[in-house]
Amino acid sequence: MLLLKAKRSFEGYVLISPEGNGIEGIAFVPATNGAAAGSFYLVNQSDELGGPDPSIVFEVEINHAASGPEARIVRYFSVGVTDLSGIHYDASSGRLLIISDSNEALLVVSLTGDVLESYPLPGKKQEGITIDGNGSLYIAQDAKEALLKLIQK
């Protein structure tokens, strides 16, 4: 097992507070230019849109240096809602699917951070999101119904 550590700040701005809620979701996006393996997109669960420890999405690249691999934050963006709790990369559309627990919303977001679509979600306490091989969307919940199947393409 390899443990990668990333700094909690980017260009002097604190993105992840040690006392905060922390990272809730991670998705891998393969590189299209062949220069790197790809990037990880992570969501930080927070009740704040600004200030230290904001509710944001950030992109992390892995640098395979001679001294060992290092995780490096390369950029971040806000999607305008708090309490981000899950993220999935939809390779068929090239978009990120992001859920917000307290807002009970599904956001469709470009890799540059533009919110393209927003949908209300049924249920409560959505925590995880994925798409199966048939294009059906599943959301895990910390509620009575543990798994929701929402959309079939």
Model-derived segments and their meaning:
Residues M1-K153:
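Sequence/structural signature of beta-propeller domains
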